[in-house]
Amino acid sequence: MNGKGDAELKGRYEWIETQDYHMKSAWSDTSIECASHFWQRRLTVAASNEVVITDQVQLPESASLEFLFILHPAVEVSLEEERIVLTNGKTQVVLRWEADKPVSWKLSAGKCFIADRTLASRRLHLSANAASFSLRTFWHLEN
């Protein structure tokens, strides 16, 4: 969010070993880069074909928020009115969302690192303006 990631959170890759396949971490920071006094992210494996990411943000005043989702270079993206379809070959993931404030999505060029190489990729941006913000993204594997 706003240029800060959850990579600094302890246990980022250990969630699968936690009870009931839930990961919950909280991070607070008053730096200018973050612009957030509190950001909590929770990852839940809702079913064998669905992951839900829940974000809660609390700010002292309303601000512009941006969440980035970096995509693999082989993923094709279709932005639709109420969903986003991510396709790689015959595999398709449908992304839906619920938010307590209006959000907008856009796609931009980006980079990712695979096998020690920098590759061109794309990024999904979710933007909102709020002091208090709740977001749930549902990542559903279709086939």
What are these regions (language model features)?
Residues 1-143:
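CBM-like, beta-strand-rich accessory domains located in the C-terminal region of large
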